[in-house]
Design a protein with these regions (language model features):
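C-terminal motif of bacterial Sec signal peptides marking the signal peptidase cleavage site
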Residues: 18-22
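Sec/Tat-exported extracytoplasmic proteins
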Residues: 46-49, 53, 96, 100, ...
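Bacterial N-terminal signal peptides that target proteins for export
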Residues: 1-8
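Hydrophobic/aromatic residues in well-formed alpha-helices
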Residues: 42, 118-121, 146, 177, ...
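PPIase-associated folding chaperone regions across multiple families
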Residues: 25, 134-213, 217, 291-389
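N-terminal targeting/tethering segments
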Residues: 24-141
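Peptidyl-prolyl cis-trans isomerase
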Residues: 206-321, 329-341
Length: 389
């Protein structure tokens, strides 16, 4: 009996030791279908989540672009209802789970990385590590974790293309991608006729009517068949002349020493004697606007997309300007399509791909290491500005 008790006691001690060891193991963050994702990958995704949070904040306040550019902290801000650290953790955990889904899809589809792919991965890993190794090591990200993330990203691209590239599982055609360009981008030439200095100012009806009449005269000439580029140049010359006249009516101010301002135009022009002939722009005066653009104004962009058809010219008015807008076929700009085709493909099917990954994930067993989640705080994944260290 005593022997049995001793054996049971030993087994209990071993079991407790195993349990404590398992609970204390923070080398991994999540297991999906038994496949383990290291904590270093999670921490790396936290840093990516911080950048993503910055872009989310900048979408409503452009000042956050400067925060990111100059390394200013925005950890104390909120993205929607989440604090930035909460956003980072959720982002990192989601990406860690998706990591495994991508790996499994890559294998299921029988995809492979080419030798060129592997060389590019090596280059990217070494470049990222060599430039940031000290910071990565400080926050707990090893070079192997960097390699895993970059390799997984390359695999994700191949999985995406297997589904959504032309000839892939989805049945995408080249016309589908071109339709995205046509639906989301507009190609225009336009002239601006200002009638107010600020949207907050009371409208000067006389000034507004003069701008409207001027704009209408140019629109009439376009509709009569005159060349748009020639009219734009004419209008710009009028604007320049008006600005020059306005400058000339200002009084000459003396220098700080009381003397007249020196005319250095001759000296200034000396450096401009050598002229370099630039190649002619095949698409002069053209602007390409995305449907999400807010400049020159949201009213302008919305009107261009909803009220002006390709081949038409119309007047557009916002709070401070009247515009003469001529809309052209964006698909005729083959250079835009060729240079941005891959980006259009991703934009077209990004949500579909995310849904595909999430649907796969729902059918998998997922185990989250709460000990690792508690240990690896989002704040520690962000390099603090020098004055905060």
């Amino acid at each position: 009996m005593n022997t049995i008790k001793k054996i049971v006691a030993v087994l209990m001690v071993v079991a407790m030791a195993f349990t404590l060891t398992a609970c204390g193991d923070t080398s991994w963050i999540v297991k999906v279908e038994g496949e383990t994702v290291p904590s270093g990958v999670y921490i790396y995704y936290q840093t990516v989540g911080y950048t993503s949070a910055g872009y989310e904040l900048a979408a409503t306040d452009a000042n956050y672009y400067y925060y990111m550019m100059y390394g200013m902290s925005y950890l104390d801000q909120k993205v929607g209802e989440k604090t930035v650290p909460e956003y980072m953790n959720d982002y990192a955990l989601s990406m860690s789970k998706q990591y495994v889904v991508v790996e499994r899809l890559f294998d299921e589809l029988g995809l492979e990385l080419t030798e060129d792919d592997k060389k590019l991965i090596d280059t990217q890993v070494n470049s990222l590590w060599n430039g940031n190794s000290e910071q990565f090591e400080k926050i707990g990200v090893g070079k192997e974790s960097i390699r895993k993330v970059i390799t997984n990203s390359a695999k994700e691209e191949k999985v995406f293309n297997a589904y959504y590239e032309v000839g892939g599982i989805n049945g995408t055609t080249e016309d589908d991608i071109k339709a995205y360009l046509e639906d989301n981008y507009a190609r225009v030439k336009y002239m601006t006729f200002n009638y107010a200095d600020s949207a907050d100012d009371a409208v000067d009806e006389t000034r507004k009517n003069e701008a409207l009449a001027d704009a209408q005269s140019y629109l009439d000439r376009i509709l009569a068949g005159e060349d748009v580029d020639t009219l734009i140049e004419e209008h710009q010359a009028e604007v320049n002349a008006a600005n020059e006249e306005s400058e000339n009516t200002k009084p000459d101010l003396p220098d700080a020493d009381g003397g007249e301002a020196e005319d250095n135009s001759a000296e200034d022009g000396a450096a401009d004697d050598v002229e370099v002939e630039e190649p002619a722009n095949p698409y002069p005066n053209e602007s390409i606007f995305s449907k999400e653009a807010t400049s020159p104004s949201e009213k302008f962009v919305n009107y261009v997309f909803t009220e002006i058809k390709v081949g038409e010219a119309k007047l557009v008015q916002d709070d401070i300007n009247i515009y003469v807008v001529s809309k052209m076929d964006v698909l005729e700009r083959t250079d835009i399509y060729e240079q941005n085709r891959d980006s259009f493909l991703v934009a077209l099917f990004d949500k579909d791909f995310t849904s595909l990954v999430n649907e796969r994930l729902e059918g998998y067993s997922v185990e989250v290491n709460e000990g690792s989640v508690k240990r690896y705080k989002a704040e520690n994944a962000v390099e603090k500005p020098s004055e905060e260290q």
